[in-house]
From Swiss-Prot:
Name the record gives this protein: Merozoite surface protein 2
Keywords on record: Cell membrane, Disulfide bond, Glycoprotein, GPI-anchor, Lipoprotein, Malaria, Membrane, Merozoite, Repeat, Signal
Residue windows of the Sequence repeats: 55-60, 61-68, 69-76, 77-84, 85-92, 93-100, 101-108, 109-113
Major place of residence: membrane
Gene of this entry: MSP2
Bias kind Polar residues: ranges: 169-195, 202-230
Keyword Membrane attributed: yes
């Protein structure tokens, strides 16, 4: 009987020790899981909504970019393009591409042949028609066409001195049409200086001036693209918000701060799981101790 009692007591202690170890492991894992869940919940509550931040950043970027693009582009396209086109006596360009094509090309062609050098036109023979190229897109091409037209006019004036009386009539018609176009230009472009096309001016000085005036229009057409790039502030705000969010990712809630201070009464629902798990572990240990004392008392006194 004594051997049975001793063996039962030894088995009981072994069972109690294993049970306590298992309960402690289970309680520790439960506590760790509950703590991790509470931390995750508090982090989700403390984080700002990332979708709203990204949306506001993109909205600011697209707004600034659209304002710069449409505003400056529309001003440079419609304002400067229309001025260059109508000033040359051609169709007014409505866009930025029409400024270089129709505006500047028509300046070199019509200015060289008709308006700038009418004296050389009077000396030109009817057998040699005026050949001027109007399909120019750059300022260098405009300058080259103007110089070529001047050289041709000068050569015609030297080689054909006899055809003055025959060609003056169409030149007078050209002068009348040019005067009408000048009146229309003055009415349309009041802010710009009108191009002088008098019969007394034999040197084509208006062509380089208009070629130089067409150069800022090309620069103005390229300026909205350059201006719209630094005003796109969407990416900076987007990265700044993410950076500020990543700088302090471990913001704890007020309930966790109060729990760390020791005020367990003010703990939230997330940390109540910790108290429940610790209470369950302590209750299990208490039950094990009571059962151990009862078994020992029966084994000793029986």
């Amino acid at each position: 009987m004594k051997v049975i009692k001793t063996l039962s007591i030894i088995n009981f202690f072994i069972f109690v020790t294993f049970n306590i170890k298992n309960e402690s492991k289970y309680s520790n894992t439960f506590i760790n899981n509950a703590y991790n869940m509470s931390i995750r919940r508090s982090m989700e509550e403390s984080k700002p909504p990332t979708g709203a931040v990204a949306g506001s950043g993109a909205g600011a970027g697209s707004g600034a970019g659209a304002v710069a693009g449409s505003g400056a582009g529309a001003v440079a396209g419609s304002g400067a393009g229309a001025v260059a086109g109508s000033g040359a006596g051609a169709v007014a360009g409505s866009g930025a591409g029409a400024v270089a094509g129709s505006g500047a090309g028509a300046v070199a062609g019509s200015g060289a042949g008709n308006g700038a050098n009418p004296g050389a036109d009077a000396e030109r023979s009817p057998s040699t028609p005026a050949t001027t190229t109007t399909t120019t897109t750059t300022n260098d091409a405009e300058a080259s066409t103007s110089t070529s037209s001047e050289n041709r006019n000068h050569n015609n004036a030297e080689t054909n001195p006899k055809g003055k009386g025959e060609v003056q009539k169409p030149n007078q018609a050209n002068k009348e049409t040019q005067n009408n176009s000048n009146v229309q230009q003055d009415s349309q472009t009041k802010s710009n200086v009108p191009r002088t096309q008098d019969a007394d001016t034999k040197s084509p000085t208006a062509q380089p001036e208009q070629a130089e005036n067409s150069a800022p229009t090309a620069e103005q057409t390229e300026s909205p693209e350059l201006q719209s790039a630094p005003e796109n502030k969407g990416t900076g705000q987007h990265g700044h918000m993410h950076g500020s969010r990543n700088n302090h990712p471990q913001n704890t809630s007020d309930s966790q701060k109060e729990c760390t201070d020791g005020n367990k009464e003010n703990c939230g629902a997330a940390t109540s799981l910790l108290n429940n798990s610790s209470n369950i572990a302590s209750i299990n240990k208490f039950v094990v101790l009571i059962s151990a004392t009862l078994v020992l008392s029966f084994a000793i006194f029986i």
